[in-house]
């Protein structure tokens, strides 16, 4: 039994200093597939909208937008409507990246680089609102409170926000992958112990691997993936709201 990270599928050699070669990994390919599928779904749901005689497709699109608006308003208020597309994009991308493993492709959320990229975007927005609300000088002065020797700890506290968000999402998704893999291996071993003595092909059939892994996959890939996407987006909304000085 082996647990490996994303494989490097292709390497583009460059002469750019400090950047090195550009590697095409499973994470990158799967992410682009998810983005292409989500873009196609959005185009399909959003075209041909009508004011009357609304189709089921349009009703589904309106339901998604309404629920997303309500989510942002409940967590951020009515002054942050410009972030509805961002929150919705992160939520959809997170769910898509979690569920793509169901069809046998590598899950981008099992790679820390994916969550780190999302967390960096959120961190930049948090810093933007803190500086916009308090001013650059007041923000820098706040890093020295209550005394200047606390500056390293205050800086670490600022950086810990995106780090904790990334590792929380990544850790929960990875743990689900590890548990599913261990269970699959354990069931294979159990099948071999109990039925390996049977003659011919019957002894090679992994009976305990039929059906049981599907239930764990249903939980970790579907339910768990949706919960983690919801938590990440909720934290994003709350942190941006607090950075803007809203209570």
Label each PLM-derived region with a short phrase.
Residues 1-247:
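Selective transmembrane helix interface/packing segments
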């Amino acid at each position: 039994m082996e647990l490996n990270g994303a494989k490097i599928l292709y390497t583009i050699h460059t002469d750019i200093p400090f950047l090195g070669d550009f590697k095409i990994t499973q994470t990158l390919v799967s992410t682009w597939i998810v983005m292409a599928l989500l873009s196609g779904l959005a185009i399909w749901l959003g075209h041909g909208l009508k004011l009357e005689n609304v189709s089921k497709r349009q009703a589904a699109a309106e339901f998604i937008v309404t629920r997303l608006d309500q989510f942002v308003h409940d967590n951020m208020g009515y002054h942050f409507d410009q972030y509805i597309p961002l929150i919705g994009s992160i939520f959809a991308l997170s769910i898509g990246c979690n569920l793509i493993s169901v069809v046998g492709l590598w899950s981008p959320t099992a790679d820390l680089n994916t969550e780190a990229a999302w967390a960096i975007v959120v961190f930049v927005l948090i810093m933007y609102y803190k500086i916009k609300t308090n001013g650059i000088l007041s923000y820098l002065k706040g890093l020295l409170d209550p005394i200047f020797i606390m500056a390293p700890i205050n800086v670490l506290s600022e950086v810990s926000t995106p780090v904790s968000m990334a590792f929380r999402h990544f850790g929960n998704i990875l743990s689900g992958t590890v548990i599913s893999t261990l269970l699959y291996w354990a069931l294979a071993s159990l099948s071999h112990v109990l039925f390996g003595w049977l003659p011919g092909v019957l002894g090679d059939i992994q009976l305990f691997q039929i059906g049981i892994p599907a239930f764990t996959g249903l939980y970790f890939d579907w339910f768990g993936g949706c919960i983690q996407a919801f938590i990440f987006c909720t934290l994003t909304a709350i942190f941006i709201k607090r950075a803007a000085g809203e209570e």
